[in-house]
Amino acid sequence: MTSEQIIDRTKKWITDVVIGCNFCPFAANVVKQQTVFYKVEETTEMDACLDSFVHEMKRLDDNASIETSFLIFPNAFQKFDDYLDLVSLAENRLKRDGYEGVYQLASFHPLYLFENSDENDPANYTNRSIYPMLHLLREESIDKALENYKSPESIPFRNINFAKEKGLAYMKMLRDAL
């Protein structure tokens, strides 16, 4: 599959699942404004993947027109535990490089599993993507969006309730239809 095809599938997942289920009430606006950047990282080497993550932070530094960036790993981190290692290293790198409070890291994986949850819990599908990916968001933009959103702390609970109400079969079908 080409990078373009991977990006197209990722965009469809964002449109159909993230926006369609309203998991992120702010996503529709940045997609509509076309201020999302997508980067496919083909390597499977951890160091190269971290270098790519650092490059994405610098890309956001250099391009104010980009609100958010998805770094997609179609060939790496097939095991969720390996992916969690990447997330931990990326979060540490974000802090070490002075980006804490500047960028926020969100994580998505095909086998995403919330702590203390069962693998068949439909709530996991709020973060189950079609590829392992890291999502960088500008903290300033998040803060601005939250100013106009009533009860932002309720978003995760609303998402979990939605997924559980729809059920495992529906959430799995929605994601796997891509």
Segments the model singles out, each with a brief description of its role:
Residues M1-L178:
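Expand to "…catalyze enediolate/carbanion chemistry for C-C bond making/breaking, isomerization
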